[in-house]
Amino acid sequence: MGFTDKQEALVNSSWESFKQNPGNSVLFYTIILEKAPAAKGMFSFLKDSAGVQDSPKLQSHAEKVFGMVRDSAAQLRATGGVVLGDATLGAIHIQKGVVDPHFAVVKEALLKTIKEVSGDKWSEELNTAWEVAYDALATAIKKAMV
């Protein structure tokens, strides 16, 4: 079974909720650094800070990550696969030293953030929709890293 209209709608609605509160981006990166403190140096907007502090660059990057997962959901529903819109993503991830375990950390942070953002609208179905979309995006990025 492919990615459904309902799954795409779940991702879209929670994406909209995510964007409404800038604190969600801080939460996302806080979770990442709790799991992988060494990853701090991979993010230019965190490298020289004492901790995770809100900034336009942090907001922009978080929205880009969540937005790409949302776009992946749309692609999965429409075509059954994900094609990167930015051909440089693989090279950027290589340059930053991203390795396979980092994708798992980001996935966990993304899913925890979405759960927090969704509040009483959270469900296993919502979680699965984000998980499937993220996994497809991560696979596409990893392929581009070769």
From Swiss-Prot:
The keyword Phosphoprotein applies. GO terms for molecular function: heme binding; metal ion binding; oxygen binding; oxygen carrier activity. GO terms for biological process: nodulation. It holds the Pfam family Globin. Keywords: Cytoplasm, Heme, Iron, Metal-binding, Nitration, Nitrogen fixation, Nodulation, Nucleus, Oxygen transport, Phosphoprotein, Transport. InterPro entries: Globin, Globin-like_sf, Globin/Proto, Leghaemoglobin-like, Leghaemoglobin_Fe_BS. The modification Nitrated tyrosine is found at residues 29, 134. Coiled coil: none annotated. Root nodules. O2 binds at residue 61. The modification Phosphoserine is found at residue 44. It is found in: Cytoplasm, Cytosol; Nucleus. SUPFAM superfamilies: Globin-like. Residues 2-146 form the Globin domain. Its main location: cytoplasm. Monomer. PANTHER family: LEGHEMOGLOBIN-RELATED (PTHR22924), NON-SYMBIOTIC HEMOGLOBIN 2 (PTHR22924:SF92). Belongs to the plant globin family. Leghemoglobin that reversibly binds oxygen O(2) through a pentacoordinated heme iron. In root nodules, facilitates the diffusion of oxygen to the bacteroids while preventing the bacterial nitrogenase from being inactivated by buffering dioxygen, nitric oxide and carbon monoxide, and promoting the formation of reactive oxygen species (ROS, e.g. H(2)O(2)). This role is essential for symbiotic nitrogen fixation (SNF). This is Leghemoglobin-3. It comes from Medicago sativa.
